[in-house]
Amino acid sequence: MNKFISIIALCVFSSYANAAFTLNSTRYIYNEGQQSVSVNIHNESEHKYGGQVWIDNIDKNGEVVFFSPSPMVFKLNPKQKQIVRIVNINDNLPKDRESIFWLNVQEIPPAPKGDGGSLSLAINNRVKLIYRPIALKNGRDEAENNIKLINSGTDSCLENTTPYYFAISDVKINGKSIDLNSDAKNKMGVFSPFSKVCLGNVNTSGNITVTAFNDYGVATSYTVQRSK
């Protein structure tokens, strides 16, 4: 009997536990001078959902607003699509490198039916929004080829010598993935322009490659060159 009740409870809990919204991209590039960027949000569920959109600053003063989504709040019927436009309202951003932000699309699930014993989860879809100055518009393709291996004390480090943000998911030496600590993994996922991430005290005498995602979310392997 208890097992049967547990299965029923799990089914009730799971009815709204899966993400309802899907986005048309895993990252959005806002080129300087662009009028807006469109975010297509699709409700994959069988229920009407509310939605809320906002943008968080990653490496800037949290009180300064650079982008405004429209609409910020909306309702979305089952299997329907909502287009949200992101507009740059403050161009006081660096012109010699990219700036990065988090774009948040929060699901607002319908109220559970019944006696209040069931739960619904409000899932937040968070993806990168990258502001690219006009001077950098044409140099992004294959920019990961400019990642260098440098020595910093006893550590070996990867250096991003470019003005672009990289999203690195894996680092390999002679075809074998190395075990990075959580701090290094996080920094690799948002590899800032003109910065370095140290790999620790590892043997880097062999062939070093990184797997990185480009503007379209496609993973590609790149060979890391040693700094001369």
Swiss-Prot record:
InterPro entries: Ig-like_fold, PapD-like_sf, Periplasmic_pilus_chap, Pili_assmbl_chap_C_dom_sf, Pili_assmbl_chaperone_bac, Pili_assmbl_chaperone_C, Pili_assmbl_chaperone_CS, Pili_assmbl_chaperone_N
Record's keyword terms, sorted: Chaperone, Disulfide bond, Fimbrium biogenesis, Immunoglobulin domain, Periplasm, Plasmid, Signal
Pfam families: PapD_C, PapD_N
Localization (cell): Periplasm
GO cellular component: outer membrane-bounded periplasmic space
Keyword Signal: yes
Signal peptide: 1-19
Domain of life where this protein originates: Bacteria
Keyword Flavoprotein: no
Disulphides: 157-198
Protein's GO biological process: cell wall organization; chaperone-mediated protein folding
Family: Belongs to the periplasmic pilus chaperone family.
Entries under NCBIfam families matching the protein: PRK15211.1
Function description: Mediates assembly of pili by forming soluble multimeric complexes with pili subunits as an intermediate step in the assembly process. This protein is involved in K99 pili assembly.
Protein name: Chaperone protein FanE
